């Protein structure tokens, strides 16, 4: 049973999948940082200093000035957070699109290469004749 599990776990596809998941997690963190630390501040500057992380509609309770305080007071719609996550998604989707496009292009190049021509029957027969002739002389 342990041997079967080891064969299953160490198959190429399983290891590739595990590596992909780990790299994907790291890539997600990188995209979050790019969006939160670079893109959103630039968008905030362009839009007159709007802080998207603190944009919300408070549905209940006394009006609050921060999203955290509004969430403690009651239900809120955090649309600024949604905008940030939407930008995250679009960046990840775009990068994945580019990766898949590149892989498809490389795959087409690989398929386009013609297979080496097989030697003709005459060439093979000539080689066999030469080998037999050498064996008879020896």
Curated annotation (Swiss-Prot):
Subcellular localization(s) per the UniProt record: Cell inner membrane
Single GO term (MF): mechanosensitive monoatomic ion channel activity
Keyword Coiled coil tagged: no
Annotated coiled-coil segments of the chain: none
Domain of life, source organism: Bacteria
Keyword Chloroplast in record: no
Membrane-topology descriptor: Multi-pass membrane protein
Pfam short name (any one): MscL
One GO CC term on file: plasma membrane
Transmembrane regions listed in the UniProt entry: 15-35, 38-58, 80-100
Main localization (coarse): membrane
Keyword list, A-Z: Cell inner membrane, Cell membrane, Ion channel, Ion transport, Membrane, Transmembrane, Transmembrane helix, Transport
Alphabetical list of NCBIfam families matching this protein: mscL (TIGR00220), PRK00567.1-4 (NF001843), PRK13952.1 (NF010557)
Function per UniProt: Channel that opens in response to stretch forces in the membrane lipid bilayer. May participate in the regulation of osmotic pressure changes within the cell.
Family: Belongs to the MscL family.
Assembly and oligomerization: Homopentamer.
This protein's name: Large-conductance mechanosensitive channel
Designated gene of the protein: mscL
């Amino acid at each position: 049973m342990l041997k079967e599990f080891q064969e299953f776990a160490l198959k190429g596809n399983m290891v590739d999948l595990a590596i992909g998941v780990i790299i994907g997690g790291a890539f997600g963190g990188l995209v979050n940082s790019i969006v939160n630390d670079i893109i959103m501040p630039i968008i905030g500057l362009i839009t007159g200093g709007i802080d998207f992380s603190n944009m919300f509609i408070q549905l209940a309770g006394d009006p609050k000035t921060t999203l955290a305080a509004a969430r403690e007071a009651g239900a809120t719609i955090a649309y600024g957070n949604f905008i940030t996550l939407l930008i995250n998604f679009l960046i990840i989707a775009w990068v994945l699109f580019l990766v898949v496009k590149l892989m498809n292009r490389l795959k087409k190049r690989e398929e386009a290469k013609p297979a080496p021509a097989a030697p003709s029957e005459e060439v093979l027969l000539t080689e066999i004749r030469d080998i037999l002739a050498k064996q008879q002389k020896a």
